[in-house]
């Protein structure tokens, strides 16, 4: 095991329950999944057996963390252990009392999922919610965090689709007005035919943008800084970035994506599902169906241990989990998205290199188009 192969960021799913039903949510594609809350003994086991190397505890997953009755005490426990504590919420349950409790418990960063900045479009995407309510909660959160003698950050997680991509230009203004410190933009996961029609990466996954070096026949285009608000500059940049015939460099930095690479593994992350099962990444947390180019792919959950039977440190250091991380770092998987999407891709049981599940070559996170905070 490499000396730097240590667990640094632990994702905790407090609950699989959610008070919303967003039309593009990954939950819509779940197959035979049980819904429930994390039990106190499961959370306690995670906290008492996690390796000392853990720096950040992130409360998120596929449910709404604030729906768990003990979420404040969970945050307090993680903070008392000297860990940086972050939490991702849809913001609807973040009233003044809950804000005060979370800040008092030691929350270091709050992430809010906001996928539209227009009231009508927000209501279409996030059913049972109103953007005005979330904005009110942000204002109150900012009022309370400004009175603290420590820094608490605010982030926004934005899922971009064809129907809301035009709102990206509004994010800097929204973020400045509402004192947002960081914005994480991810593409949408195609869970059905409708969301498949909303994706903005149909072509980019075919390109070798993540390769270490461009092909000999591919020219390098070096761009200087420009007035990007100028329509002529915008059109020129759009044209360059929409072709795979060259490698584009901006101020000496290559515009690329980290394809065939797993951020979850490379950055030392792990996920604890609400029931105590430990998964290496978000993609392997649930059984689900994805749609891509008129084809369905079955994604199957994969776990390397259960906190009911082992400690988190034992699970992380187990030979099979360590070997999986080695394979993913070397990315010994077939390049599914640069192929014709064969039966192996659809079933997800093996790949064309003979790897058994999990076959990470068919993962959109590894292609650099899906991103989690």
Language-model-detected regions and their locations in the chain:
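Radical SAM enzyme [4Fe-4S]-AdoMet core and its adjacent flexible, acidic
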Residues: 13, 33-38, 81-84, 104-279, ...
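A broadly structural signal marking compact, well-ordered functional cores
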Residues: 55, 91, 247, 251-255, ...
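A structure-centric signal for secondary-structure junctions around beta-strands
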Residues: 6-7, 19, 151-153, 266-267, ...
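Conserved alpha-helical substructure of the radical SAM core
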Residues: 1-109, 120, 124-128, 132, ...
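Flexible mid-to-C-terminal extensions adjoining Fe-S/redox cofactors in radical SAM and related proteins
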Residues: 1-6, 28, 277-278, 282-373
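Residue-level signal for mature regions of secreted extracellular proteins and peptides
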Residues: 11, 15-18, 255, 274, ...
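Short, flexible loop/turn elements at secondary-structure junctions
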Residues: 63, 91, 158-160, 340-343
């Amino acid at each position: 095991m490499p000396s730097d192969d240590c667990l640094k960021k632990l994702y905790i799913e407090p609950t699989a329950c959610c008070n919303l039903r967003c039309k593009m949510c990954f939950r819509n594609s779940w197959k035979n999944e049980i819904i429930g809350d994390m039990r106190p003994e499961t959370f306690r086991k995670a906290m008492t057996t996690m390796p000392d190397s853990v720096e950040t505890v992130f409360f998120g997953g596929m449910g709404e963390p604030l729906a768990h009755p003990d979420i404040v005490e969970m945050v307090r426990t993680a903070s008392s252990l000297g860990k940086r504590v972050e939490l991702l919420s849809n913001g609807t349950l973040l009233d003044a009392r809950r804000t005060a409790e979370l800040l008092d418990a030691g929350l270091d960063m709050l992430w809010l999922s906001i996928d539209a900045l227009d009231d009508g479009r927000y209501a279409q995407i996030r059913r049972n919610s109103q953007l005005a309510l979330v904005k009110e909660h942000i204002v109150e959160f900012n009022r309370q965090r400004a009175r603290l003698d420590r820094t608490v950050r605010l982030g926004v997680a934005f899922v971009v689709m064809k129907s809301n991509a035009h709102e990206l230009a509004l994010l800097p203004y929204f973020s400045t007005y509402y004192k947002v410190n960081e914005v994480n933009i991810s593409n949408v996961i195609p869970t059905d035919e409708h969301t498949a029609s909303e994706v903005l990466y149909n072509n980019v996954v075919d390109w070798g943008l993540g390769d270490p070096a461009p092909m000999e026949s591919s020219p390098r285009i070096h761009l200087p800084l420009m007035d990007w608000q100028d329509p002529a500059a915008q059109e020129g940049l759009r044209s360059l970035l929409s072709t795979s015939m060259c490698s584009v460099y901006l101020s000496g930095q290559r515009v690329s994506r980290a394809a065939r690479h797993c951020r979850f593994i490379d950055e030392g992350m792990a996920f604890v599902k609400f029931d105590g099962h430990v998964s290496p990444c978000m993609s392997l947390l649930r059984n689900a169906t994805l749609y891509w180019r008129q084809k369905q792919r079955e994604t199957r959950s994969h776990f390397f241990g259960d906190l009911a039977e082992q400690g988190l440190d034992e699970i992380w250091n187990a030979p099979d989990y360590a070997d999986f991380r080695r394979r993913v770092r070397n990315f010994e998987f077939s390049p599914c998205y640069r192929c014709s999407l064969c039966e192996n891709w659809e079933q997800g049981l093996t790949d064309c290199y003979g790897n058994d599940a999990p076959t990470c070559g068919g993962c959109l996170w590894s292609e650099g188009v899906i991103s989690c905070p």
